[in-house]
Amino acid sequence: MALPLKVLSRSMASAAKGDHGGAGANTWRLLTFVLALPGVALCSLNCWMHAGHHERPEFIPYHHLRIRTKPFAWGDGNHTLFHNPHVNPLPTGYEHP
């Protein structure tokens, strides 16, 4: 009685069938080349086309940001180590390039 149940249960297993997922691999390969790679290419193109269209936001001097209790040890003491004048404002506002 136990033998037919065991034979039936092993026939449901994928390892007993001998198929190692070749159809699943082909499906994922197709999805990668048809959907994923063109999607990444379109998103990259969109980012590249709109990269230079950003305007500098208005400076609002919040009292809890850019607090300088002592000067930095480099430069004039007011600029951070990796200061970028295009995007990083000083406590008084943006620098004019």
Swiss-Prot record:
Transmembrane segments: 26-46
Major localisation: mitochondrion
Transit peptide region: 1-12
Segments on the Mitochondrial intermembrane face: 47-97
Database matches in Gene3D superfamilies: Cytochrome c oxidase, subunit VIa
Pfam families: COX6A
InterPro entries named in the record: Cyt_c_oxidase_su6a, Cyt_c_oxidase_su6a_CS, Cyt_c_oxidase_su6a_sf
Pathway info: Energy metabolism; oxidative phosphorylation
SUPFAM superfamilies linked: Mitochondrial cytochrome c oxidase subunit VIa
Quaternary structure, from the entry: Component of the cytochrome c oxidase (complex IV, CIV), a multisubunit enzyme composed of 14 subunits. The complex is composed of a catalytic core of 3 subunits MT-CO1, MT-CO2 and MT-CO3, encoded in the mitochondrial DNA, and 11 supernumerary subunits COX4I, COX5A, COX5B, COX6A, COX6B, COX6C, COX7A, COX7B, COX7C, COX8 and NDUFA4, which are encoded in the nuclear genome.
The protein's name in its UniProt record: Cytochrome c oxidase subunit 6A2, mitochondrial
Protein encoded by which gene: Cox6a2
